[in-house]
Design a protein with these regions (language model features):
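Conserved donor-binding loop and adjoining core beta-sheet/short helix segment
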Residues: 7, 11-15, 25-105, 213, ...
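A short beta-loop-alpha structural element at the N-terminal edge
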Residues: 4-20, 29, 156-170
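Generic hydrophobic alpha-helical scaffold/packing signal
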Residues: 172, 207, 221-224, 235, ...
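Flexible, substrate/cofactor-facing loop regions flanked by secondary structure
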Residues: 38-39, 147, 151-232
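A structural microfeature
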Residues: 69, 134-135, 219, 249
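Acyl-donor-binding surface of acyltransferase catalytic domains
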Residues: 74-154
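Conserved acyl-CoA
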Residues: 94-109, 242, 251-263
Length: 263
């Protein structure tokens, strides 16, 4: 007999438990919720874009002490996600009600992020008065196919043992257009990439970095290898403005494909 209890999420105590829960319920189509590296990448980015101030609002459902459901926000804090173990679909109405009543920050409207296959949650959301406002597509590449875009002349792949986290931070600063909007690189948020590098399940060594002839990092593709789910989760991906539309990102993805296929 099930014995369902709820409790609030604790950053210090629960990140590892939630990661394992997401590993255990993972399905390729995300019908049970986001993959584990999605969560860890976000919560390891608290020094930069992820606001964990309100993480106490995140809620965990347990059955005899085992995590079976999780409601949480990412970025922005108004985007609410749901992870639900198969066989516990009856919790969907309670999860939607919890989000509706407790996940709003200072009265802001929330939006529920649901994936195809999360039928029980979708039904509960509609019964609560929610409706589908938009749709996006998350792409996955099957390694049974081939990815083989060439590296443009004048660029090279940086060897993993030579990765420079300071250069990665500068590449991300420029690659996500912060230089245009906030000024030149002055080591802003450099701690963010360090925290990502040392995250519990980070696989920094599998990232792909492309540099120009002067050694400046031109393109960066992060990689969170999750062997338990046979998932190569790429996050982030950026190219600095002066080298865009040259095929660097395609070349980086091709190199990731070659490396991860071997793994």
């Amino acid at each position: 007999m099930k014995n369902i209890t709820t409790r609030q999420f604790s950053v210090l105590a629960d990140c590892g438990k939630i990661y394992q829960f997401m590993l255990d319920i993972y399905e390729r189509d995300w019908k049970n919720g986001v993959p584990a590296p999605f969560f860890e990448y976000a919560f390891s980015s608290f020094a930069y874009w992820m606001d964990i101030t309100y993480s106490y609002k995140n809620c965990i459902w347990e059955d005899h002490g085992e995590i079976v459901a999780f409601c949480f926000y990412e970025a922005p804090v108004t985007d609410i996600y749901f992870s639900l173990k198969p066989g516990y679909e009856e919790l969907a109405p309670a999860m939607i009600s919890y989000a509706d009543e407790h996940m709003s920050i200072k009265g802001e409207n929330i939006q529920l992020i649901l994936f195809g296959g999360q039928d029980a949650l979708m039904k509960a959301a509609m019964e609560k008065g929610y409706y589908q406002a938009s749709e996006t597509i998350d792409m996955q590449f099957d390694f049974e196919e081939m990815l083989n875009y060439p590296l443009p002349e004048g660029f090279h792949f940086v060897k993993p043992e030579e990765y420079d986290i300071d250069k990665v931070s500068k590449c991300c600063w420029k690659g996500f257009d912060h230089e245009q909007n906030e000024g030149p690189w002055e080591h802003q948020y450099e701690q963010s990439n360090y925290l990502l590098k040392v995250a519990p399940h980070a696989t920094w060594e599998h990232a792909v970095i492309i540099a120009d002839e002067k050694g400046e990092y031109a393109c960066y593709a992060g990689m969170w290898w999750t062997p338990q789910n046979k998932l190569a989760y790429m996050e982030p991906l950026c190219t600095i403005p002066e080298y865009r539309n040259m095929g660097l990102a395609s070349a980086a993805l091709s190199e990731l494909y070659r490396r991860m296929k071997k793994g």
